[in-house]
């Protein structure tokens, strides 16, 4: 489909433009389970800014179930260290707001408010596979609810 590697769309929005299809009608297959993504998964790929990958010149994305599963596997296999926000700024010599940090669970990019909340709550940032991660507000809320109901 896309033989020239330089012209391959890297995001779902770019893929929709290249195929002249709306995001509501695009059909993409999961790179892991090979099932077609449902609408919610397609919107999740767009919202989390996950890159499109290619196998045999065909575009693939990732479904939510595989994303969560392989994010956990990646965390177990490739975890390096955890540091507080001030330490991370000292290590990288950059402000947290200038760093690209994703949620280690759902891979969504963290916004400035989420980064600040992690600092305020004295939560750590994690280096996994050479990239810095934290926890987004959505995943944080889920863990809090799960922990509070287990009492």
Curated annotation (Swiss-Prot):
A motif (PDZ-binding domain) lies at residues 149-151. It is found in: Host cytoplasm; Host nucleus. Keywords: Activator, DNA-binding, Early protein, Host cytoplasm, Host nucleus, Host-virus interaction, Inhibition of host innate immune response by virus, Inhibition of host IRF3 by virus, Inhibition of host RLR pathway by virus, Metal-binding, Modulation of host cell apoptosis by virus, Oncogene, Transcription, Transcription regulation, Viral immunoevasion, Zinc, Zinc-finger. The keyword Zinc-finger applies. The keyword Transcription applies. InterPro entries: E6 (IPR001334), E6_sf (IPR038575). One of its GO terms (cellular component) is host cell nucleus. A zinc finger (unnamed) spans 30-66, 103-139. One of its GO terms (biological process) is DNA-templated transcription. Forms homodimers. Interacts with ubiquitin-protein ligase UBE3A/E6-AP and thus forms a complex with human TP53. Interacts with human NFX1 and MAGI3. Interacts with human IRF3; this interaction inhibits the establishment of antiviral state. Interacts with human TYK2; this interaction inhibits JAK-STAT activation by interferon alpha. Interacts with host DLG1; this interaction leads to the proteasomal degradation of DLG1. HAMAP family: HPV_E6. Plays a major role in the induction and maintenance of cellular transformation. Acts mainly as an oncoprotein by stimulating the destruction of many host cell key regulatory proteins. E6 associates with host UBE3A/E6-AP ubiquitin-protein ligase, and inactivates tumor suppressors TP53 and TP73 by targeting them to the 26S proteasome for degradation. In turn, DNA damage and chromosomal instabilities increase and lead to cell proliferation and cancer development. Belongs to the high risk human alphapapillomavirus family. The cancer-causing human papillomavirus E6 protein has a unique carboxy terminal PDZ domain containing substrate. Belongs to the papillomaviridae E6 protein family. This is Protein E6. The lineage of its organism: Viruses, Monodnaviria, Shotokuvirae, Cossaviricota, Papovaviricetes. The gene is E6.
